């Protein structure tokens, strides 16, 4: 797996493509057929335009033999990284502790 630069999160679709699909010679179309989902759904995922849902995680885990939690953790890590970049978070003042 490639080294991820500090402060950068890879989209789970990139990991799906580079670590699972490419080594097996799987196209988006073929994976979609194996998962019983639409080809645009898988294509959008590997292009970073769609998130991994619980349903998708279950399908991927059933096909690749890993856990659904693996896929959901990848998505959660990416979502947290994206959300943490929101500059409005810095404007939030902590609530004062009760005396």
Language model regions located:
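A short, Lys/Arg-rich alpha-helix, primarily the initiator
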Residues: 2-26
């Amino acid at each position: 797996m490639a080294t991820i630069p500090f402060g950068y999160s890879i989209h789970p679709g990139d990991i799906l493509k580079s670590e699972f699909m490419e080594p097996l010679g799987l196209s988006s179309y073929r994976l979609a057929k194996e998962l019983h989902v639409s080809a645009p759904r898988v294509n959008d995922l590997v292009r970073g335009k769609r998130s991994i849902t619980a349903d998708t995680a279950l399908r991927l885990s059933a096909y690749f033999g890993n856990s659904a939690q693996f896929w959901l953790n990848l998505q959660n890590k990416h979502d947290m990284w994206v959300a943490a970049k929101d500059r409005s978070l810095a404007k939030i003042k902590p609530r004062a502790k009760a005396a």
